[in-house]
Regions:
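Alpha/beta-hydrolase fold nucleophile elbow
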Residues: 457-474
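Cap/lid segment of the alpha/beta-hydrolase catalytic domain
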Residues: 312-338, 350-448, 453-456
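C-terminal motif of bacterial Sec signal peptides marking the signal peptidase cleavage site
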Residues: 22-25
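Bacterial N-terminal signal peptides that target proteins for export
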Residues: 2-14
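The feature captures the conserved acid-bearing segment of alpha/beta-hydrolase catalytic domains
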Residues: 492, 498-570, 575-628
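Short glycine-enriched nucleophile-adjacent loop
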Residues: 471, 477-487
């Protein structure tokens, strides 16, 4: 059985983990006064100076089958002689599996260079300066010469996960790099030590200008790859910077993932699947809706058959969950599942073309039941459908494993499964499967038609496929950009607590830290720029909402004190979606007002993005602020359906302290982990 197999596997791995210890070296005998190091940055392909003695990422650290060396990341093993085992001692195995899930690097992840001295913060560029061709540290698109805005910091505090003097270059949050593009990170000699000494060029640079020699500290293949990179870097410096080649201290070149690959494959395969039928199982009486003033509505219970786009067996706690892209570019289907759904049908005169269609997906722990839910927008005059978020209608046999670990409620178990840090394939594909299910449900409602008699209407009651909106909260909001990108006919999106750049949530949300504590005893060290967190983001990139651009009408709510979708991830999401941020409280910043929010429009806003309306409202308060703004969301929805033009109305906008359990985590004094 799946439960016994998983438990037995966990026990065997736990026993195996007890044989792992971190090797330590005895200190050398003192030999006299130490000689100060010549300031520089390591570029050692053989990693003789540690994991980051070769910049990460770099294309020599990958292959077509995956990453080459994630299992050597510092801090992932446990020394059983000096440290207690974490509750699930699987981190080395998880990382080993993670490095097979991707074969290119992240669009939103950091670059790490290891210096041998403390660097002067004043010699590093501020975010606004990183797009200047003369900045001391640059991140460049090699195909176009475009400079990416970044946050450049020197991490001086060493811990089990990283060495000291770790120069870190993070794409500015909300400004992801291009998909499937080669980037070069460049460090120049106007970066100095705290003593004022300029960094000296890595000795590797001179070796790359020479024919390969076996005495060089690299293989012939590494030399050939790096020499090719260096040729491209030379051209980039000459053509797109004000620096001289002699200014260069160190570089790294890498390709970003084609993050849309799996999602495009699923969408292409869905086109070959007949639109499923919404199979009605019961039709409720027409009754007044307490949440939809003046409306008489019927709740219709139904089921729908949905394709499964992941291999393996549900619920994918430890294994399975991979999206398999076939040679024809389409995702392989692995059967179907029957999902419960509910509809709310107006008991009033239907427009000639049918009812406008709205589908909704709730947050983690939610389900398909409409009941007394507080909707994002009122449902008067629309055909409203609700589908469960992934794992909201069942967690399979995972409960037997997770309950003894403290995750006893279905909601807690659903969260562990959706944000599944125990299975890299699953954490990467869960949002893809979820997005596919809401998209297919939306398509099914576009062709939904039933006799109108139960609703007091002649003929049939049906939807109007020319007027469609998708909505979601939290987990359900995270995947809305994918759906909108896949189906440009969707007229609008209303998103509550949308999230992008999931490394923010991993670092700050108390619930994600609780999950991380299953596999490491050092979750308090997992700040935003922790390399392990950046590796997780690399795996997650294919389903991060920040990577899926669309241009439909879009209203989002971000909440400053949110402990589920933390404010950093909400603003990251908003920027990446090109949503104009209207702040009702001071926004957080990574150092650049211009990069945080190019312009702040005055409400009301209409057609601010090429004719469509795209706005994110930043509010004080907690995770459920959308409940305080149903009138505003309704105005956005109804105006769009009535006129084809969406308007974000004037305030005031409400907020409350209602929130997820727990307090957000910050690594004092660093709110952002930088």
């Amino acid at each position: 059985m799946r439960t016994r197999t998983s438990l037995r596997r966990l026990q065997l791995i736990a026993v195996a983990a007890t044989t792992v210890a971190i090797a330590t070296a005895c200190p050398a005998e003192p030999t006299g006064p130490s000689v100060p190091p010549v300031p520089g940055i390591a570029m050692n392909p053989q990693l003789s100076g540690g994991y980051f003695s070769m910049p990460w990422p770099n294309d020599i650290r990958r292959s077509d089958s995956g990453m080459n060396d994630w299992t050597s990341l510092p801090g992932i093993n446990t020394d059983i002689f000096t440290e207690p085992l974490p509750p699930i001692p699987l981190l080395p195995e998880i990382v080993a599996k993670g490095q097979t899930t991707v074969n290119q690097f992240g669009r939103q992840t950091a670059v790490f260079f290891q210096a041998n001295v403390e660097l002067a913060a004043a010699s590093l560029p501020a975010p606004d300066q990183t797009t200047s061709s003369g900045a001391s540290v640059l991140l460049m698109d090699l195909a176009t010469g475009e400079l990416a805005p970044t946050v450049v910091v020197n991490q001086e505090r060493a811990d089990r996960f990283r060495p000291a003097h770790l120069l870190t270059v993070l794409p500015y949050p909300g400004h992801p790099l291009r998909s499937d593009a080669r980037y070069a990170a460049l460090v120049f000699d106007d970066v100095t030590s705290t003593s004022g000494d300029a960094l000296t060029p890595s000795a590797t640079l001179a070796q790359l200008d020479q024919p390969y020699d076996p005495s060089m500290p690299m293989t012939a293949a590494q030399h050939a790859n790096l020499a090719g990179q260096y040729t491209d870097v030379k051209s980039a410096i000459a053509n797109h910077t004000t620096h001289q080649l002699s200014d260069l201290v160190a570089f790294t070149v890498y390709r970003t993932q084609k993050t849309e690959r799996e999602w495009d494959a699923i969408v292409a395969a869905m086109a070959d699947v007949p639109t499923p039928t919404v199979n009605v199982t019961s039709t409720g009486a027409c009754t007044p809706s307490s949440r939809d003033v003046g409306a008489s509505m019927s709740i219709v219970k139904a089921t729908i058959s949905l394709p499964i786009w992941r291999n393996g067996s549900f619920p994918y706690l430890f294994e399975g969950g991979k999206v398999v892209v076939q040679p024809n570019g389409k995702a392989q289907q692995f059967g179907n599942r029957t999902a419960p759904v509910e509809l709310m049908v107006p008991c009033s005169t239907m427009p000639a073309a049918g009812w406008p269609i709205v589908t909704h997906m709730d947050g983690t722990g939610g389900d398909e039941q409409i009941g007394t839910d507080i909707p994002i927008a009122r449902r008067n005059g629309v055909l409203y459908g609700k589908i469960s978020p992934l794992y909201g209608d069942g967690v399979g046999d995972a409960g037997a494993i997770l309950s003894p670990l403290g995750f006893s409620s279905p909601r807690a178990q659903a969260e562990v499964l959706f944000y599944n840090l125990l299975n890299p394939d699953s954490i990467r594909s869960n949002p893809l499967q979820q997005a596919a299910e809401q998209l297919m449900f939306t398509k099914a409602l576009e062709s939904f038609s039933v006799p109108g008699a139960p609703f007091g209407q002649p003929g049939n009651v049906h939807g109007d496929a020319s007027k469609v909106m998708i909505t979601g909260h939290s987990q359900g909001a995270q995947t809305l950009p994918m759906i909108a990108a896949a189906d440009p006919s969707i007229d609008g999106v209303i998103s509550s607590s949308g999230s992008g750049g999931q490394y923010h949530t991993l670092a700050h949300s108390p619930r994600r830290l609780n999950t991380l504590s299953l596999v490491t005893n050092y979750a308090d060290r997992l700040d935003e720029l922790n390399p392990l967190i950046q590796v997780v983001q690399t795996v997650f990139e294919a389903s991060d909402g920040a990577n899926f651009a669309n241009d439909t009408n879009f209203l989002n709510y971000t909440n400053y004190d949110d402990t589920c979708s933390v404010v950093e991830t909400g603003l990251h999401f908003s920027r990446a979606q090109n949503l104009a941020i209207v702040p009702f409280t001071a926004p957080t910043s990574y150092g650049s007002t211009a990069l945080d929010n190019g312009s702040v429009p005055s409400l009301p806003v209409q057609g601010n993005y090429g004719g469509t309306t795209r706005v994110s409202i930043l509010l004080p308060g907690g995770h459920f602020n959308y409940m305080q703004n149903v009138d505003k969301s309704t105005a956005f929805q109804d105006g769009l359906f009535a006129t084809g033009i969406a308007t974000v109305p004037v305030g005031p906008y409400g907020y409350s302290s209602a929130n997820c359990p727990g307090d957000r985590y910050d690594d004092p004094p660093r709110r952002f982990g930088i």
